[in-house]
Curated annotation (Swiss-Prot):
Family named by the database record: Belongs to the TRAFAC class translation factor GTPase superfamily. Classic translation factor GTPase family. EF-G/EF-2 subfamily.
Main location: cytoplasm
Compartments, record wording: Cytoplasm
UniProt-recorded name of the protein: Elongation factor G
Length: 690
């Protein structure tokens, strides 16, 4: 196979879903049937091939996305297994950035759950074409048709049903292929390796015809010529239908819906056929956005083997045998071990040593990789998640990834002096792997503070510190990551002067501070004209503001959601310096924040509780007592779904309360929504504690 057309044969896909929808099991089966796993790994026995960290095998949830290469028909499939727990959405976000297509796995009983919505929105953000696999069709309460409706209602997506289930719950036997109009039935005794096609059962004929018509009505809209043919009563061929499904999937006109039971080994091979048949190859994606370093211009770069080398680092992992591994997705050109490339974000050269193709937890050395490939590089010195590696002579920076701010923090202290140094190393390694995990020092207390996306996120970090780095630490109680902001516009004119023999210091700045909408962060703009402040001093002003906004004026929390506009200033030929302007900016900030009617902000979480009807009243009462605002209540099967916005500060230990309120029958999920003002009486308590 030549390198050029090799791109047509590659599928870079992610498998993503809500926790417990059966994502890892589905991936396991794919690896089994494509010949990569000789033994099927069961998640609930703690032996799945993709879940390779000890914590994952214990908890039965996937934390880090392992990248795996396998083959089906004549195609190469690179699979990224993504976590479904809400504390790990960063992993999903990273994976989606480098994928060409995705399979969204849904639980046939629960349907579209909160995390499914989050992942779906993330995939929308990166325009990832996807298909839906409704799993667990063998389970009590599984309902394929209700799931399809939920995909429509909850995700606002256009499902294209291309399979129907044959039998339901314990009688689930196989599927009806609506393209070929055949039933596909699995033999139970052969671990799903043997299946055969037969005529559609008589009791399913009418339903199959109905859904076949719906399928044709939807796909022919993509091609006027075939639509005319269809409307005039001519037969649309199987090849034409498959071509239209592929085109519609790639353009996101609709999302093919398949079904099966990965655990019972049914429906996985047709899912693989659909992955290679309908999801895009890198050629279908065609381009990647980036910036040309020499000109600073944003451009579209073609995905091609013949173009100069460009790749995105999307994951860093500590491997017990190889050390630090950097996973890259190559967009163009090729790379060989021993060659030198440049990290264009850090402007540092990197020498390529070992290159590995990964299969969940074992590895294969390769000497060369090219456009479309996902490989792991060992021993890179300066590259972190989101960096671009590029050809030295034709440098580009690919579109960067955005990472969410952490919402929860903990103080950690090493148990002994021997642990002190090891802890520093462990935390810096873990922070390099995970951009949503931050480490800082509290200067007042001298404590090390770790910040993350939720209690489970930080629990796992501490666990890894203990197991992988042998660091024992004392852990403080979780703290909320409060923020501060201003609520009115103010203008500050500040002059910094210092004269005490020798060279003095002089800088004058006039800055307008104004509030922004929630989520807009901090924005700095210079409107200096006519050289009132020379160009070389302006970065000093921005640096000063950026540094000082980390400690707000109410209780010392970082300031967010405001804009600082530099409108005027003055300088002195001898006494002005970058440092003088930095000091002036900091003083102007202090004054401006106090005049801008500052307010304390707290993270508000979107909480979704699924409960049997009889506990509904108690659960709503409890959420209200936690300052929760109920957003909606929806019936789902034999349960109620309560969605509310609740301050994170009120949610610690909620899992135990919910368990006792509902005798363990209700479950909840929580995801960060936005920052909002803290009521004044509560703000006073928080200030007093600081």
């Amino acid at each position: 196979m030549t390198k050029i057309n090799k791109l047509e044969y590659i599928r870079n896909i992610g498998i993503c879903a809500h926790i417990d929808a059966g994502k890892t099991t589905t991936t396991e089966r794919i690896l089994y049937y494509t010949g990569k796993s000789h033994k099927i790994g069961e998640v609930h026995e703690g032996g799945a091939t993709m879940d390779w960290m000890e914590q994952e095998q214990e908890r039965g949830i996937t934390i880090t996305s392992a990248a795996t290469t396998c083959r089906w028909q004549d195609k190469i499939i690179n699979i990224i297994d993504t976590p479904g727990h809400v504390d790990f959405t960063i992993e999903v976000e990273r994976s989606l950035r480098v994928l060409d297509g995705a399979v969204a796995v849904f639980d046939g009983v629960a349907g579209v759950e909160p995390q499914s919505e989050t992942v779906w929105r993330q995939a929308d953000k990166y325009n990832v074409p996807r298909m839906c696999f409704i799993n667990k069709m063998d389970r009590m309460g599984a309902d394929f048709y209700r799931c399809v409706e939920m995909i429509k209602d909850r995700l606002g997506a256009k499902p294209l049903v291309i399979q129907l289930p044959v039998g339901i719950e314990e009688n689930f036997k196989g599927i009806i292929d609506l393209v070929k109009m055949k039933a596909v039935i699995w033999k139970d005794e052969s671990l799903g390796a043997e299946y055969f096609a037969e005529d559609i059962p008589a009791d399913m004929k009418y339903k199959a015809e109905e859904y076949r018509t719906k399928l044709l009505d939807m796909v022919v809209e993509l091609d006027d010529h075939i639509m005319e043919k269809y409307l005039s009563g001519e037969e649309v061929t199987e090849e034409e239908i498959e071509r239209l499904i592929r085109n519609g999937t790639i353009s996101a006109a609709f999302y093919p819906v398949l079904c099966g039971s990965a655990f019972k080994n049914k429906g996985v091979q047709p899912l693989l056929d659909a992955v290679v048949g309908f999801l895009p190859s890198p050629i279908d994606i065609g381009i990647v956005k980036g910036i040309e370093v020499s000109t600073g211009e944003e451009k579209d770069f073609p995905i091609s083997v013949t173009e100069p080398f460009a790749a995105l680092a999307f994951k860093i992992m500590n491997d017990p045998f190889v050390g630090s591994l950097t996973f890259i997705r190559i967009y163009s050109g090729k790379i060989t071990s021993g060659s030198t490339v440049i990290n264009t974000v850090k402007n540092k050269r990197e020498k390529i040593g070992r290159m590995l193709l990964m299969h969940a937890n074992n590895r294969e050395d390769v000497k060369e990789a090219s456009a479309g490939d996902i490989v792991a590089l060992a021993g890179l010195k300066d590259t972190t998640t989101g960096d671009t590696l590029s050809d030295i002579d034709k440098q580009v920076i690919l579109e960067r990834m955005e990472f969410p701010e952490p919402v929860i923090e903990l103080a950690v202290e090493p148990k002994s002096t021997a642990d002190q140094e090891k802890m520093g190393l462990a935390l810096s390694r873990l922070a390099a792997e995970d951009p949503s995990f931050r480490v800082s020092m509290d200067h007042e207390t001298g404590q090390t503070v770790i910040k993350g996306m939720g209690e489970l996120h930080l629990e796992i970090i501490i666990d890894r510190m203990r197991r992988e780095f042998k660091v024992e630490a004392n852990i403080g109680a979780p703290q909320v990551a409060y923020r501060e902001t201003i609520t009115k516009i103010c203008e500050i004119d500040y002059t910094h002067k210092k004269q005490s023999g020798g060279a003095g210091q002089f800088a004058r700045v006039k800055i307008i501070f104004e509030p922004l909408n929630p989520g807009e962060g901090f924005v700095f703009e210079s409107k200096i004209v006519g050289g009132a402040v020379p160009k070389e001093y302006i970065p000093g002003i921005e640096k000063g503001l950026n540094n000082i906004r980390e400690t707000g004026v109410i209780a010392g929390y970082p300031m967010i959601d405001f804009k600082a506009t530099l409108v005027d200033g003055a300088f002195h030929d001898v006494d002005s310096s970058v440092l003088a302007f930095e000091i002036a900016a900091k003083a102007a900030f202090r004054e401006g924040m106090l005049k801008g009617n500052p307010k304390l902000l707290e993270p508000i979480m979107k909480v979704e509780v699924i409960t049997p009807d009889e506990y509904m009243g108690d659960i709503i009462g409890d959420l209200n007592s936690r300052r929760g605002q109920i957003q909606s209540m929806d019936p789902r099967a034999n349960a109620q779904v309560v969605t509310s916005n609740v301050p994170l500060a009120e949610m610690f230990g909620y899992v135990n309360t919910l368990r006792s309120l509902s005798q363990g029958r209700a479950q909840f999920s929580m995801i960060f929504s936005h920052y909002d003002q803290v009521p004044s009486q509560i703000a006073d308590v928080i200030k007093a504690k600081k």
